[in-house]
Amino acid sequence: MSSAPRRPAKGADSFCTPEPESLGPGTPGFPEQEEDELHRTLGVERFEEILQEAGSRGGEEPGRSYGEEDFEYHRQSSHHIHHPLSTHLPPDARRRKTPQGPGRKPRRRPGASPTGETPTIEEGEEDEDEASEAEGARALTQPSPVSTPSSVQFFLQEDDSADRKAERTSPSSPAPLPHQEATPRASKGAQAGTQVEEAEAEAVAVASGTAGGDDGGASGRPLPKAQPGHRSYNLQERRRIGSMTGAEQALLPRVPTDEIEAQTLATADLDLMKSHRFEDVPGVRRHLVRKNAKGSTQSGREGREPGPTPRARPRAPHKPHEVFVELNELLLDKNQEPQWRETARWIKFEEDVEEETERWGKPHVASLSFRSLLELRRTLAHGAVLLDLDQQTLPGVAHQVVEQMVISDQIKAEDRANVLRALLLKHSHPSDEKDFSFPRNISAGSLGSLLGHHHGQGAESDPHVTEPLMGGVPETRLEVERERELPPPAPPAGITRSKSKHELKLLEKIPENAEATVVLVGCVEFLSRPTMAFVRLREAVELDAVLEVPVPVRFLFLLLGPSSANMDYHEIGRSISTLMSDKQFHEAAYLADEREDLLTAINAFLDCSVVLPPSEVQGEELLRSVAHFQRQMLKKREEQGRLLPTGAGLEPKSAQDKALLQMVEAAGAAEDDPLRRTGRPFGGLIRDVRRRYPHYLSDFRDALDPQCLAAVIFIYFAALSPAITFGGLLGEKTQDLIGVSELIMSTALQGVVFCLLGAQPLLVIGFSGPLLVFEEAFFSFCSSNHLEYLVGRVWIGFWLVFLALLMVALEGSFLVRFVSRFTQEIFAFLISLIFIYETFYKLVKIFQEHPLHGCSASNSSEVDGGENMTWAGARPTLGPGNRSLAGQSGQGKPRGQPNTALLSLVLMAGTFFIAFFLRKFKNSRFFPGRIRRVIGDFGVPIAILIMVLVDYSIEDTYTQKLSVPSGFSVTAPEKRGWVINPLGEKSPFPVWMMVASLLPAILVFILIFMETQITTLIISKKERMLQKGSGFHLDLLLIVAMGGICALFGLPWLAAATVRSVTHANALTVMSKAVAPGDKPKIQEVKEQRVTGLLVALLVGLSIVIGDLLRQIPLAVLFGIFLYMGVTSLNGIQFYERLHLLLMPPKHHPDVTYVKKVRTLRMHLFTALQLLCLALLWAVMSTAASLAFPFILILTVPLRMVVLTRIFTDREMKCLDANEAEPVFDEREGVDEYNEMPMPV
């Protein structure tokens, strides 16, 4: 050819080999070491050929051959793209686009198919790409004699990067040999075509045919091999001179070469060149086909094996689930056949199978050896880790695991069958022998017969089992992919069986949506060294006859090895099982992307573990510090978890996110706080109505549950017993002006109204000890000042309504927050002391009225005649059941009855001890839990019934009975009626007393306010998980207003009873059955409804008709219940416990916060101050000023806020005055509702 071809522009065709004339004689080649380093740095093969200048390639020989990697990279990159001939049309026939500027994103190529093949580029897309490239090609592709590195511009798409990265990890597949002549040429233009071919060969310095193969051998690259059935390919066909780079923008786009060369060629030659250079030849566009070889299914960068890796499906993000872990060991059965036997399981704590009895032991915290954890970490670091394995059956998983073990050189190829056989052995469980129905385990020996059950393919074989794992043919892989796309078949009816009782019981304890971890460890002698595999399945699947219960399996851990290895397989199995049951580790296992994530999670677990020294422990008390240290470690771990979210791959939250989260939490807390003040009159009351009344209809629908019926029966007796007890004592204190009938009617009426209108229907309103103390004090005040007691209560009721409206209007319920544990414990301790004192005071009074008689001879003349006459005259009148003296209302109480004092003592003590013992029996170990709870909850009614029967059976001894009228009547009809005249019954009530009644009204309001609001606070604790909310203002207004109105009818005012309300809430609490053995019970829901309280109030009101039965109850039995309430109220009072510490050496002090964080003398000082306040209250109660005791009690609030804060530090006050009481739902010995509240009964 006359004119020498011009050098191609570097930016236009980066893959053209430069002319040898442009290379210096001494230009060195690219060093092999630097090339390897650049491979590792850039991560893309042949990437340096794009980056380096043309002159730097002089080290390569001009005639070197190009392998299949060159072709693949050349085709898949954006540097050289063949376009169909239809794209080379005049500009007016094509839609032109703006050039690709730096501000525009490059057009994204279609992603590769899942099989790794490159999709065909559509013609329309090429038109757009060609038009966009044509605008910017003028400035970038102008031929220049010298090119600089800054002129190199290339674009590497994301798909290119992924494809090249996949190719880098796999060996290059054989490529076809180039034919001698690949492109058909017309005979008419053979000479011109040969000239063009020679010019191109001179420009690129590459010989075709055999010359390329020789040069290729010299360059050190393997000779490409032609694949059968594919057209051979020659690099010469992809070459064109540099002037053709911008041919699309030429004025004559149909001319395939430069102007000078085109003038020397005939038209046929030009057409041939057009066909060769512009057309999309199918043979050239054909994609490479390689021999199929299954790649490693291992996720992440760890342990990737060479081989073509098809592009996997994107992994769906794993959401951590609750976990169930089962440890199986390879042991011999009674027939000396190996099998997998379950030896332990973890739901939260470890449960081991006792070897001798084959029973499950008690749940306990797993204690691990430090060496086993180190061995586990080492095995995970060197073993096989397969993440997101896409298998549905145990045989498929086993084959993948075994092949991965062979690939990672853990086992020999000849051990493949033995390991596989070991993995597919049958599994046995301790519960199998208890089931006499269809056998649960299906033998895996006949594996072929199970394939149809697993896949529903009839007689077809399982590809996972019958085909080799590596090197399979493409057809098998396609069949497997089609099979995975099919929905999982339903279990065949032939092997379906009903779950056993043991399985159902265990499934109740496993959390919902839990996923299982199977741990398989054992000794096999055919292996020379241990082998390990950790598998996480892509989707959790149920593996037949593997687990004890049908729970889907997500993780598998396998450890096999010889007994000669210095490794305890059982301990390593326990270690990985304990790790998987740990919340932080199994969350990290779900989110792990590679092996390093698991190793990091193990290190985090070790950071929070406690190592005990190898010393002998003499007692459990020596291990108390271990539990304390462990709690500190867990607290630190939780704090770190809040700063850095757990799980692999998660970034820490930014400061903005933390601030936003705190604002949201603060806003939510402020919105849900019912004590927050609005600043408007009655604003809190309006918020209570808007919060609670929208749930009004659901309050009745939610009562349609059997548990509510059981709660009605239980709470009825729990409410009736105090009503009878306090009613009898109130009648004693007020000379029957207010007695049992008035208290029962008041409880019924106010209970019905409150359950219909109240904001928190779980509250049980009733009479309490503080109100009883006030009623006694006010009655004494009225008697000493010759005032009518019932009329004075009416005016107190009027002032109560006014005070309630004023408090609610000012949103004063927030003041309950200032009533701390310091005041509550003094109040509760005072009432308990009053209960205990009143019991023994009444008993002593009985002994004074009915003294004991000494034994004397019948003929003695020194016997007191008066007393004998009383005893002799009374004895004949006693009828069966000593009932004849019960109704002597007009004759007064009999005195000096024989054996009355002793029988009263027996009845009182018997009632107390029976009720107290049944309360303890509730949390004992006898009988099933349900029976114990029923007996314990009805302990007080059972004690009353037993002692009433004892009294009834003793016919000749008098005891004072409960005074209850017949029918619907007041206790003393001769003294009062149902309606009280506010102006006076027998004489006009003084006007000054109408106004002065404000003071006792304030005192009563203080008592009702404290009891009601503190009880509502206890019920509304967040640990109880109430959903409908409470209403402090609405409940206070209803209770106080109803008490004020009931005073017009001579009925006692009531308050929220703390113990009964907590008992009511506990009875309506549904505990979750999915509680791990050894774990605390968790609340599932609370039946928040109005029906149970409504029915209880109605039943208490109807109890007035059983007056005949109530009249059989001796007062001594009520004294026993009074003593029981006083003693049990002391439980849970920290003040009472600290009083014990005054008499106890410091070495015997309990391990509690206020002992460990506060010095002993400072703690005793705090106790002494509380004791001083208690003594002051008791002194006030013992004087004529006993009516003012609520005012003295409320003064302890400013005392704590002003005085104690100057004596004690904030840290000491938090330890001594913190409200640490939590709801009690479990069955710990000696712990019940009384331990939860420092409030009086």
Curated annotation (Swiss-Prot):
Residues 708-1241 are annotated as: Membrane (anion exchange). It holds the Pfam family Band_3_cyto. Keywords: Anion exchange, Antiport, Cell membrane, Glycoprotein, Ion transport, Lipoprotein, Membrane, Methylation, Osteopetrosis, Palmitate, Phosphoprotein, Transmembrane, Transmembrane helix, Transport. Glycans are attached at N859, N868, N882. One of its GO terms (molecular function) is chloride:bicarbonate antiporter activity. One of its GO terms (cellular component) is focal adhesion. InterPro entries: Anion_exchange, Anion_exchange_2, Anion_exchange_CS, Band3_cytoplasmic_dom, HCO3_transpt-like_TM_dom, HCO3_transpt_euk, PTrfase/Anion_transptr. Residues 1-707, 919-933 are cytoplasmic. Residues 76-85, 94-110 have a biased composition (Basic residues). The modification N6-methyllysine is found at K274. Residues 848-900 are extracellular. PROSITE patterns: ANION_EXCHANGER_1, ANION_EXCHANGER_2. NCBIfam families: ae. This is Anion exchange protein 2. It comes from Homo sapiens. The lineage of its organism: Eukaryota, Metazoa, Chordata, Craniata, Vertebrata. The gene is SLC4A2.
